[in-house]
């Protein structure tokens, strides 16, 4: 069991301090997850270091790089890497069984263009990712912290938007998705106010699910039950 921290922001989105977001219970690794970590980490795992990655060294080539924050069990991330072999993918996840599951699926799929961090995403972004190096940042279904008193814990805040903008190259895209409509409205408000971005939606709101984001089983079930999912895509223009 380990403590996971997140940032706290004031009402203007100014960073205040790190606070404990939740206590992560690692859960038991399945035999397959443990074996995948042991066998695949040397080739697909990235050990955190507070110095920026040289992506061409990590992947052995120059290519657009997509980074996903909090990939869960990793099925969608592996599918994206498989569907776009011309791109590089980096996933960050603090839940160890999710890391094991992702590595297992990646090995089975035979993908070679995926690397994984088991670390705090804010630290990785701040220190291990060079400014202007990413073609896309993905944040899919983050915790909505739906109670008003917990809104300060939401990851999409003004300073976070600025951090992502710095890491994107000009023309790069910050892609968010949520199944909580009120959080999508919060995301839209934050991103519309963030300098250096342009909303890719034709009507200035949300976009249809793009082809590059796979439809998850959870999401497909939600559609059948009439639940919505909202995608937002903002391009770095400055």
Curated annotation (Swiss-Prot):
Keyword Methyltransferase found: yes
One GO MF term: tRNA (guanine(46)-N7)-methyltransferase activity
Keywords, comma-separated and alphabetical: Methyltransferase, S-adenosyl-L-methionine, Transferase, tRNA processing
Pathway(s) per entry: tRNA modification; N(7)-methylguanine-tRNA biosynthesis
EC number: 2.1.1.33
Protein origin, superkingdom: Bacteria
Broad EC category: transferase
Catalytic site positions: 143
GO annotations of cellular component type: tRNA methyltransferase complex
Known role: Catalyzes the formation of N(7)-methylguanine at position 46 (m7G46) in tRNA.
PANTHER family: 3-DEOXY-D-MANNO-OCTULOSONIC-ACID TRANSFERASE/TRNA GUANINE-N 7 - -METHYLTRANSFERASE, PENTACOTRIPEPTIDE-REPEAT REGION OF PRORP DOMAIN-CONTAINING PROTEIN
Xref: HAMAP family: tRNA_methyltr_TrmB (MF_01057)
Protein's recorded name: tRNA (guanine-N(7)-)-methyltransferase
Species of provenance: Shewanella baltica (strain OS223)
